[in-house]
């Protein structure tokens, strides 16, 4: 199959999928226009019925019990999760399955709550990371400068416990006659070690 033909088939397929998806969206628009609107502010919850009242009152029910409100909005002040949670329904005229809209509501509210948007949360996180990195660099440079000002400590060497480097405080030890090196001109008992002829 040639590349030009492949592109034409792909374009035709994409157009048919887009047209098919648009038909489904037309039916979805009818459904999405009939959704409840829920507004929460502090301890106040307001439900808005998706039905338009054409000359009639809107009836509200909670868990199959009628509520006294006949307006489009149901205002629940001092909302309590235990008392006010449940199935809410609204309808115009007589109740039947075609004109009844049902919503299950379970909300948590508080008086002193504060809503924080995404930019505020992101700026708090960025500021926290910057402060942490600043403190890390401060401690690093402080410890580096402190280490440079300190005198080097001499540590004891292996078996003798003598310092490894030249010690300026005491002179080198006096040579012990038991361990003096063998003189070149003198021929002693051990002066010929490791000098075997091979």
Curated annotation (Swiss-Prot):
Any Gene Ontology biological process = cell surface receptor signaling pathway
Question: Can you summarize the PTM annotation of this record?
Answer: Phosphorylated on Tyr residues after T-cell receptor triggering by LCK in association with CD4/CD8.
Give positions of region: NUMB-binding region: 166-183
Query: Known PROSITE patterns for this protein?
Result: IG_LIKE, ITAM_1
Task: List where the protein spans the membrane.
Answer: 121-141
Residues exposed to the Cytoplasmic side: 142-198
**Name of the protein in its database record:** T-cell surface glycoprotein CD3 epsilon chain
Annotated source species: Oryctolagus cuniculus (Rabbit)
Source lineage:
Eukaryota, Metazoa, Chordata, Craniata, Vertebrata
The gene name on file is: CD3E
């Amino acid at each position: 199959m040639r590349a030009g033909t492949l592109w034409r088939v792909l374009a035709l397929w994409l157009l048919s999928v887009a047209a098919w998806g648009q038909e489904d969206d037309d039916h979805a628009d009818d459904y999405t226009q009939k959704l409840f609107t829920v507004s929460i502010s502090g301890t106040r919850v307001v439900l808005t019925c998706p039905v338009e009242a054409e000359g009639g009152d809107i009836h509200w029910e909670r868990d199959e019990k009628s509520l006294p409100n006949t307006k489009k909005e149901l205002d629940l002040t001092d909302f309590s999760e235990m008392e006010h949670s449940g199935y809410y329904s609204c309808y115009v005229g007589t109740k039947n399955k075609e004109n009844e809209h049902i919503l299950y509501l379970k909300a948590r509210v508080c008086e002193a709550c504060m809503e924080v948007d995404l930019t505020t949360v992101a700026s708090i996180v960025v500021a926290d990371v910057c402060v942490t990195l600043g403190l890390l660099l401060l401690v690093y440079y402080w410890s580096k400068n402190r280490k440079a000002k300190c005198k080097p400590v001499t540590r004891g060497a292996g078996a003798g416990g003598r310092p490894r480097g030249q010690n300026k405080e005491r002179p080198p030890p006096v040579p012990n006659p038991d361990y003096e090196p063998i003189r070149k001109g003198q021929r002693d008992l051990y002066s010929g070690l490791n000098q075997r002829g091979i």
